[in-house]
């Protein structure tokens, strides 16, 4: 499988997991499995992965009343992976980013 990692999941809760437990949260492809996720994180960031936990979130159904009647839609399903790293290892998501104002 190609790279299953889509993007880091940066929320208040995931940042707390990173600071307290050394766990990082990623949004991954729906068909990704734990072994593919582990290999992708180790290859991309050069760290040792201790464990991987995954969870599937079903997309919500949305309804909106319009002049033509009720329009229904659905948000996309997502899959997240919680990756635990070895002792003393970190991932820096902002290493390639330039601060505002610098060219």
From Swiss-Prot:
Transmembrane segments: none
GO molecular function ontology, one term from the record: structural constituent of ribosome
Ribosomal protein as UniProt keyword: yes
Keyword Aminoacyl-tRNA synthetase: no
Matching Gene3D superfamilies: 3.30.70.330
Keywords noted in UniProt: Ribonucleoprotein, Ribosomal protein, RNA-binding, rRNA-binding
A GO BP entry: translation
Family: Belongs to the universal ribosomal protein uL23 family.
Role: One of the early assembly proteins it binds 23S rRNA. One of the proteins that surrounds the polypeptide exit tunnel on the outside of the ribosome. Forms the main docking site for trigger factor binding to the ribosome.
Official protein name in the record: Large ribosomal subunit protein uL23
Origin species: Chlorobium phaeovibrioides (strain DSM 265 / 1930) (Prosthecochloris vibrioformis (strain DSM 265))
């Amino acid at each position: 499988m190609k790279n299953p990692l889509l993007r880091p999941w940066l929320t208040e809760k995931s940042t707390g997991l990173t600071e307290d437990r050394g766990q990082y949260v990623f949004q991954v492809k729906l068909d990704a499995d734990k072994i593919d996720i582990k290999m992708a994180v180790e290859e991309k960031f050069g760290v040792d992965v201790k464990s991987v936990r995954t969870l599937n979130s079903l997309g919500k159904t949305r309804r909106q009343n319009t002049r033509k009647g009720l329009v229904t839609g659905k948000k996309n399903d997502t899959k997240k992976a919680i990756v635990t790293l070895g002792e003393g290892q970190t991932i820096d998501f902002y290493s390639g980013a330039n601060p505002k104002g610098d060219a």
